[in-house]
C-alpha cells in the first residue's frame, strides 16, 4: 500500500497518486489476461519453427496475454508426420481456439495448417492479428 506521507512525514499527494496508479495497474494485470492463440509454422524446419513459436509465446506473455500454441503442446504426444494424428492435433487446436479471445498469426509464410486455423478463426468471428517474425504488428 502506498504511503500518503513522505519519509519526512509531510503529505505527498503527487507521489501517493502515482504509486496508487502503479498498484492499480499491477493489480489489473494480475486480475485478467486474455488468451491468445499462437498461429505459426511448425512442419518443415521443426527445430527453428519450434524456437520461433516459443519466442512468439514469450512476446504474448510480455504483452499481457496468455499464449496457447497448440503446435508446441500436441506435438509432444502426437506425431505430426502421421496424417491421422496431425488431423487430431488440428481438431484439438480448433477446440482450444474457441476459448481464445484472439488469434495471432506470425511470420510472412502461411502454411497449410495455419491456413486451416485462420479460416476457422475467421468463421468463428475471432479477431485475427498479424505479426512479423520479429513480433512487429503488420497489416494484411
Name each model feature, range by range.
Residues 1-140:
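Catalytic phosphate/metal-binding cores of nucleic-acid and nucleotide-processing enzymes, i.e., regions
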Amino acid at each position: 500500500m502506498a504511503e500518503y506521507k513522505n519519509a519526512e512525514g509531510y503529505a505527498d499527494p503527487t507521489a501517493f497518486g502515482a504509486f496508487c496508479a502503479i498498484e492499480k495497474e499491477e493489480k489489473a494485470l494480475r486480475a485478467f489476461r486474455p488468451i491468445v492463440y499462437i498461429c505459426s509454422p511448425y512442419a518443415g524446419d521443426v527445430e527453428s519453427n519450434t524456437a520461433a513459436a516459443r519466442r512468439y509465446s514469450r512476446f504474448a506473455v510480455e504483452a499481457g496475454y496468455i499464449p496457447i500454441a497448440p503446435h508446441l503442446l500436441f506435438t509432444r504426444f502426437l506425431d505430426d508426420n502421421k496424417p491421422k494424428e496431425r488431423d487430431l492435433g488440428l481438431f484439438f487446436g480448433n477446440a482450444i481456439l474457441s476459448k481464445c479471445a484472439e488469434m495471432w498469426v506470425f511470420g510472412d509464410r502461411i502454411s497449410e495448417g495455419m491456413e486451416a486455423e485462420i479460416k476457422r478463426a475467421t468463421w468463428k468471428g475471432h479477431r485475427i492479428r498479424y505479426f512479423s517474425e520479429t513480433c512487429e504488428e503488420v497489416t494484411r
